[in-house]
């Protein structure tokens, strides 16, 4: 788990990801990490490494990146911030990340992404 994100939301470009993220991601995935959690930008984003990085052979192990939205109230005068949580589930076949956002009275499922585990 990282405070800063490895994966940024596509509409937020002023909050840069953690420094040297390509090297860090390679080391985390190389050490066997299958799920890397981050935050800091108050917006949810979920992706699997192989969707944006060409990896082959032993390096082709799945590695899901999940950036959590803020759990607290969005900051004043900040557009595009969500109040929400991520729920992670895993079994022998897949890692699933559910994004739940606050809808005024309760949290509701906004998105769900599932990624196959292991090598292709």
Residue ranges and their predicted role:
Residues 1-9:
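Short acidic, glycine-rich surface-loop motifs adjacent to enzyme active sites
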Residues 1, 36-38, 98:
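A structural signal for short, well-ordered beta-strand segments and their strand-loop junctions
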Residues 89-120:
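A short C-terminal boundary segment appended to hydrolase-like catalytic domains
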Residues 10, 47, 78, 107-109, ...:
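Residue-level detector of solvent-exposed, low-hydrophobicity positions
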Residues 13-91:
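Conserved beta-sheet core of the metallophosphoesterase superfamily
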Residues 3, 70, 102:
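Cofactor-binding loop segments of dinucleotide-utilizing enzymes, especially the Rossmann-like FAD-
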